[in-house]
């Protein structure tokens, strides 16, 4: 039994998100929640909400036991970038790219 969740267009760079995701891949859900709760990274808060949503979906839709769930697959893909212009001296402008990412997470029974 597997439950998948997807979060798209998150205002987080894929590179910074992968630092957090690589720590929880393959862990049991309760260990992953503890790790994400005490992580100082911005991506940890976003991924924690996504993980809790996946656990709630597995419990409600599939009737899964929370103690037996583990993070089966989790990966981050690069999303579209928001393009902005920053004013510079002498009437010029610089282009600023604000990256987004897509997070895919799957939990399953052991």
UniProtKB/Swiss-Prot annotation:
InterPro entries recorded: Ribosomal_uL22 (IPR001063), Ribosomal_uL22_bac/chlpt-type (IPR005727), Ribosomal_uL22_bac/org-type (IPR047867), Ribosomal_uL22_CS (IPR018260), Ribosomal_uL22_sf (IPR036394)
Could you tell me one molecular function GO term of this UniProt entry? rRNA binding
Identify the keywords attached in UniProt to this record, alphabetized. Answer: Ribonucleoprotein, Ribosomal protein, RNA-binding, rRNA-binding
Q: Which Pfam families match?
A: Ribosomal_L22
Among the entry's GO cellular component annotations, what is one? cytosolic large ribosomal subunit
Lineage top rank: taxon:
Bacteria
Report any one BP term from Gene Ontology. Answer: translation
Keyword check for Cytoplasm, yes or no.
Answer: no
User: What is the purpose of this protein?
Assistant: This protein binds specifically to 23S rRNA; its binding is stimulated by other ribosomal proteins, e.g. L4, L17, and L20. It is important during the early stages of 50S assembly. It makes multiple contacts with different domains of the 23S rRNA in the assembled 50S subunit and ribosome.
Q: Partners and quaternary state?
A: Part of the 50S ribosomal subunit.
**UniProt family annotation:** Belongs to the universal ribosomal protein uL22 family.
Q: What is this protein called?
A: Large ribosomal subunit protein uL22
Gene name linked to the record: rplV
């Amino acid at each position: 039994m597997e439950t998948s969740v997807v979060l798209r267009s998150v205002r987080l760079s894929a590179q910074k998100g992968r630092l957090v995701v690589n720590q929880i891949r393959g862990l049991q859900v309760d260990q992953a929640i503890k790790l994400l709760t005490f992580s100082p990274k911005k991506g940890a808060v976003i991924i924690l909400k996504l993980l809790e949503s996946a656990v709630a979906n597995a419990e409600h839709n599939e009737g899964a036991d929370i103690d037996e769930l583990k993070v089966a697959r989790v990966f981050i893909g690069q999303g579209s970038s928001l393009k902005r212009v920053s004013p510079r001296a002498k009437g010029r402008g610089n282009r600023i790219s604000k990256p987004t990412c897509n997070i895919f997470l799957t939990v399953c029974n052991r």
